[in-house]
Amino acid sequence: VERYAFGL
């Protein structure tokens, strides 16, 4: 999902 797209 987009939450993990940044790898934060």
UniProtKB/Swiss-Prot annotation:
Signal peptide: none
GO BP term (any one): neuropeptide signaling pathway
Modified residue annotations for Leucine amide: 8
Keywords: Amidation, Neuropeptide, Secreted
Tissue expression profile of the protein: In larvae, expressed in the CNS and midgut but not in the ring gland, thoracic perisymapthetic organs (tPSO) or abdominal perisymapthetic organs (aPSO) (at protein level). In adults, expressed in brain and thoracic-abdominal ganglion but not in corpora cardiaca and corpora allata (at protein level).
Entry's localization field: Secreted
A Gene Ontology cellular-component term: extracellular region
Family indicated by similarity: Belongs to the allatostatin family.
Known function: May act as a neurotransmitter or neuromodulator.
Name listed for the protein in its UniProt record: Allatostatin-A3
Organism: Delia radicum (Cabbage root fly)
Lineage: Eukaryota, Metazoa, Ecdysozoa, Arthropoda, Hexapoda
